[in-house]
Amino acid sequence: MNFVEELRWRGMVHDMMPGTEELLAKEQVTAYVGIDPTADSLHIGHLCGVMILRHFQRCGHKPLALIGGATGMIGDPSGKSAERNLLDEETLRHNQACIKKQLAKFLDFESDAPNRAELVNNYDWMKEFTFLDFAREVGKHITVNYMMAKESVKKRLNGEARDGLSFTEFTYQLLQGYDFLHLYETKGCKLQMGGSDQWGNITTGTELIRRTNGGEAYALTCPLITKADGGKFGKTESGNIWLDPRYTSPYKFYQFWLNVSDADAERYIKIFTSLDKAEIDGLVAEHNEAPHLRVLQKRLAKEVTVMVHSEEDYNAAVDASNILFGNATSDALKKLDEDTLLAVFEGVPQFEISRDALVEGVKAVDLFVDNAAVFASKGEMRKLVQGGGVSLNKEKLAAFDQVITTADLLDEKYLLVQRGKKNYYLIIAK
């Protein structure tokens, strides 16, 4: 499998330094992608870089994932308009351990294969590096003129950012360049890959390698992922879509991919899955024949959810989706954990009632009219119940004066009332 050809048909090549393809064709190459450790989880904005490493390893090359422990203490000005908060070492080490666990779902770190993945942290070689070392070994090789010509620096100096550019952030490209030099000298790493906003920093590294010891190193970047409507990829109203289920439930993760547009689904299934070209072409053709069936979105959501979480989490997410949008049973509803239940019914009207009242038992008509205003009047509720239009926990309410007790609670805390086909209400017993 040819790595560059694989990336090309997937739409994952933005820029590539001349000679890169020839290098990859003649030998097993070691390459790295830098990962910002400012959180203890990756989010889907990291996934393109991670997938590039995954394809790289599948093509027989050796991937390095570089945790920017030192550079994460500073902040990269590329594409940013303000200084970043700096992290302490203990937090960075914790974040690194969490990130490695996530990367292990994509990369082989454990086998004896010569191209097994490695995780490195630039803090390990930068922590003993003095300012005098830096000035002598790095600073003297790169001119200020060269650094000022970088687009990320120009933008910050030309007034796009109110705070200007600190010296710390100005030197970031030299630190990233030194990472490349260090990995070139210690790991034989000849290629750095990243997002297109990293081109300037990566080429500073190739230039530093050339000027320091006459070595040849290469750069490859992928496009920054956008949405077809121009919106920012990977962000929702509630923030990032994280890979860690503590921050984004598998259900919400699955729903994100399921709800992308047709145009985005066709691009994303190439970028964020390992499906081959023939299978993707077949899925696209099938989707185009019947777009309303959302074949692409369903397969995309399945592949990414299984890869990031598990088959079990994927199946649970599908079951949870069917509860809201399909003809699910009360048994399926009872299987939901509390987080998924709340995620599925996020945004529906909620009412609080006293748990003590349920211990003795309460008539449904009193509970849903007097205690929680699901219905405007008892007459309205009686009429809907008689017409079969009211369900409690996905079971039709048999009588409007049916007695409800704590035994009916989901997760010992919730009652789900459905009025008609689409109106849901969540009652919380406290």
Swiss-Prot record:
GO MF, one example: RNA binding
Binding site for L-tyrosine: 32, 172, 176
First and last residue of the signal peptide: none
Claim: Aminoacyl-tRNA synthetase is one of the keywords in the record: yes
Residues reported to bind ATP: 235
GO CC terms of this entry: cytosol
PROSITE patterns: AA_TRNA_LIGASE_I, S4
Any single GO BP term: tyrosyl-tRNA aminoacylation
SUPFAM superfamilies the UniProt entry points to: Alpha-L RNA-binding motif, Nucleotidylyl transferase
Domain S4 RNA-binding residues, every copy: 362-429
Principal subcellular localization: cytoplasm
Protein EC: 6.1.1.1
Motif 'HIGH' region in this chain: 37-46
Motif ('KMSKS' region): 232-236
Cross-referenced CDD domains: TyrRS_core (cd00805)
Keywords: Aminoacyl-tRNA synthetase, ATP-binding, Cytoplasm, Ligase, Nucleotide-binding, Protein biosynthesis, RNA-binding
Catalysed reaction equations from the record: tRNA(Tyr) + L-tyrosine + ATP = L-tyrosyl-tRNA(Tyr) + AMP + diphosphate + H(+)
Matching InterPro entries: aa-tRNA-synth_I_CS, aa-tRNA-synth_Ic, Rossmann-like_a/b/a_fold, S4_RNA-bd_sf, SYY-like_C, Tyr-tRNA-ligase, Tyr-tRNA-ligase_bac-type, Tyr-tRNA-ligase_bac_1
Domain of life of the organism encoding this protein: Bacteria
Subcellular location: Cytoplasm
Similarity comment: Belongs to the class-I aminoacyl-tRNA synthetase family. TyrS type 1 subfamily.
Quaternary structure and partners: Homodimer.
Protein purpose: Catalyzes the attachment of tyrosine to tRNA(Tyr) in a two-step reaction: tyrosine is first activated by ATP to form Tyr-AMP and then transferred to the acceptor end of tRNA(Tyr).
Protein name: Tyrosine--tRNA ligase
Biological source species: Bacteroides fragilis (strain YCH46)
